[in-house]
UniProtKB/Swiss-Prot annotation:
Name recorded for this polypeptide: Peptide methionine sulfoxide reductase MsrB
Gene3D superfamilies registered for this protein in UniProt: Peptide methionine sulfoxide reductase
KW Zinc (keyword) present: yes
Gene: msrB
An example Gene Ontology biological process: protein repair
Amino acid sequence: MDAGKGEYQIAKSDEEWRRELTPEQYGVLRQAGTEQPWTGELLDESRAGVYACAACGAELFRSGTKFDSGCGWPSFYESVRPEAVELLEDTRLGITRTEVRCANCGSHLGHVFPDGFRTPTGDRYCMNSISLDFQPEDE
């Protein structure tokens, strides 16, 4: 995975990440893969709560900012704090996109698109379910 800002609060070796994550999680979180649309466990999650990084547990999104974008991945219009995520230019597919990573550990979460959807920010954070852990508010 390409380096982002270089230093993260949670810094582990590739070997440590491989031991701690499932192969599917590793492929998305550490190798910037993408899960298939409409397959993620959190796509239809509607309870109140917080979405945290599946790799390090850092809080990333709140359920109040989640919306149905119809794209097949969980979508949010903003992160819990601007500094909770890291935004990087991604040109891997021959187009320019903005990659979203966890600012705490550098794990790949998905991409953000400024395509409106009549949200308060106009942004659509299109996240991989496998990159997130949902923590219900009532637990």
